[in-house]
Swiss-Prot record:
EC class of the enzyme, as a word: oxidoreductase
Record keywords, A-Z: FAD, Flavoprotein, Oxidoreductase, Tricarboxylic acid cycle
Cofactor: FAD
Pathway(s) of this molecule: Carbohydrate metabolism; tricarboxylic acid cycle; oxaloacetate from (S)-malate (quinone route): step 1/1
A biological-process GO annotation: tricarboxylic acid cycle
Family according to the record: Belongs to the MQO family.
Coiled-coil regions, chain positions: none
Catalyzed reactions: (S)-malate + a quinone = a quinol + oxaloacetate
GO molecular function: 2-hydroxyglutarate dehydrogenase activity; L-malate dehydrogenase (quinone) activity
Pfam families: Mqo
Database matches in NCBIfam families: PRK05257.2-1, PRK05257.2-3, PRK05257.3-2
Name the UniProt record assigns to this protein: Probable malate:quinone oxidoreductase
Length: 498
């Protein structure tokens, strides 16, 4: 599909329109620009800069989710068996992202120093039951090449050498354990988004409009959508053959406006967040890792505590949290009516059902919102016993909108991400949250392959994507040898030496 197939050949028509200026839309834009450089497409973003909402450095967890240390990705089933399928899938998806970055960096198209730093990922637990779980996890995961470099320790001194703030002022007789993977990362997805869009903007067929909001969209015939957009109070209409909705929490509202049948069963459950942040150099210099703990039994996935080394605006910080909370807004810079406007006659019963089933979760989120500063620091002390309230301040994190989906039993609350596609491939929407940004490349490859943009030349275009991400290799051959080769190649390009 090329811009020469523009049915109207005017400035109001685009082959594709991407709604949202965050990591998802920018990743898709990058892929389109690289493998379909001749198509004419538009990116619209409500705010005045890219990556300012969910992708923002303080709004995104930024871990470089590779399932190295996130214990909620390796749950126990009813029989006590450890399930690592999700961890393997996330790790492979993250390596796909790493592979694309390596290819672009090697070609001189992006600067990895602006968004990527290598830093160890650590899982930390205390108590015999949790230690047994962590050891079982270590044994199971190191059977796979993705996690072969993981270390396990119950030595107080060794764990102190890995993360000294975790053991400072902790009783040495306490039963503790940790795993460590040296090849962890800290990713600034806001900076990465800007790198992507800077590259994409070099393509003369691409237009990026900031301070531009989607108001409404409607399918006007079998091949076209009409979008009403507003820019600084001025409303205009544009047409396109393909729409991608990647506007974070607001995507659910836009998806509902599309009126595609596939949208009818969805709703959204908004969750806010807050960080404790430390800038004191004598502390930031002592902690050089991302440390994940284990959530309390029965608590939701967003309650998993982690103490992260982060680099934001060229400054090294410590972030602890995020502390979840409840709000009716779908974005930080949007309306408190977002949740209410998303309630429709075809999802109201599933949303009410989720509310009744998850009353404990709602109470938990409200209680988290009401915590005092000292109470939050007490939580931090479980991981960092020497924490002093005066060293930390509170900052709002981003909004997440978890997926509510209609089921035979009423409604189900889903944690994760999900792609919604129209049956004809003319519209795609991304819903959900974690692991999100870290797996953006794999997700956007899937979006692109199912879109009308790939309709006429799918085989050739899939090969182009493969060659972009995995030069001289075939992604379909993802065996242990392939995984080892790709990691070795990426390490070499990035200059990482295990």
């Amino acid at each position: 599909m090329t811009s020469s197939k523009n049915p109207t050949n005017d400035n109001s028509y685009f082959d594709a329109v991407l709604v949202g200026g965050g990591i998802m839309s920018s990743t898709l834009a990058l892929l389109i620009s690289e493998v379909l450089p001749d198509i004419k497409f538009l990116i619209i973003e409500k705010l005045n800069a890219p990556g300012s909402e969910s992708t923002g450095a303080f709004n995104n967890a930024g871990t470089g989710h590779a399932a190295n240390c996130e214990l909620n990705y390796t749950p126990l089933d009813e029989k006590g068996n450890l399930k690592i399928d999700k961890a393997l899938s996330i790790n492979r998806s993250f390596e796909t992202s790493m592979s694309l970055w390596a290819s672009l960096y090697e070609a001189g198209k992006i600067d990895i120093k602006k968004f990527l730093k290598f830093i160890p990922h650590i899982s930390f637990v205390s108590g015999q039951d949790n230690i047994s779980f962590l050891k079982k996890r270590f044994q199971k995961m190191t059977e796979n090449p993705e996690f072969i470099d993981m270390e396990f320790s119950t030595s107080f001194d060794e764990i102190s050498s890995w993360a000294p703030l975790i053991t400072k002022d902790r009783n040495p007789s306490t039963q503790i354990a940790a795993t460590r993977i040296g090849r962890g990362t800290d990713i600034n997805f806001e900076a990465l988004t800007k790198e992507y869009l800077s590259l994409v903007s070099l393509n003369k067929n691409v237009e990026i409009r900031y301070k531009t909001e989607l108001i409404d969209l409607m399918k006007i015939d079998k091949k076209q959508w009409e979008l009403e957009i507003s820019s600084e109070g001025r409303k205009t209409s544009i047409r396109t053959g393909y729409v991608f909705l990647g506007a974070g929490g607001k995507t659910i509202n836009y998806l509902q406006k599309s009126k595609i049948p596939e949208a009818k069963s969805y709703g959204g459950f908004p969750v806010s967040g807050k960080w404790l942040i430390c800038e004191k150099k004598d502390l930031t210099e002592k902690h050089n890792s991302k440390v994940y703990g284990k959530a309390d039994i029965g608590s939701p996935p967003m309650s998993v505590p982690h103490l992260d080394t982060r680099w934001i605006d060229n400054k090294k910080l410590l972030l602890y949290g995020p502390f979840a909370g409840f709000t009716t807004k779908f974005l930080k810079q949007s309306s408190y009516f977002d949740l209410f406007s998303s309630i429709k006659k075809n999802n109201i019963f599933s949303m009410l059902d989720v509310g009744f089933k998850n009353n404990d979760l709602i109470n938990y989120l409200i209680s988290q919102s009401l915590k005092s500063h000292n109470s939050r620091v007490e939580n931090l002390k479980n991981m960092m016993p020497s924490a002093n309230p005066s060293d930390w301040y509170l900052k709002n994190a981003g909004q997440r909108v978890q997926i509510i989906k209609k089921t035979e039993g009423g409604g189900s609350l889903k944690f994760g991400t999900e792609i919604v596609n129209s049956s004809d491939g003319s519209l795609s929407a991304l819903l959900g949250a974690s692991p999100g940004a870290s797996t953006a490349v794999s997700i956007m490859v899937e979006v692109l392959e199912k879109s009308v943009l790939f309709l006429n030349d799918k085989h050739n275009l899939k090969k182009k994507i493969n060659d972009l991400i995995y030069p001289e290799r075939t992604a379909s051959q993802k065996n242990s040898t392939f995984i080892k080769e790709i990691k070795k190649r990426n390490n070499s390009i990035f200059g990482f030496h295990p």
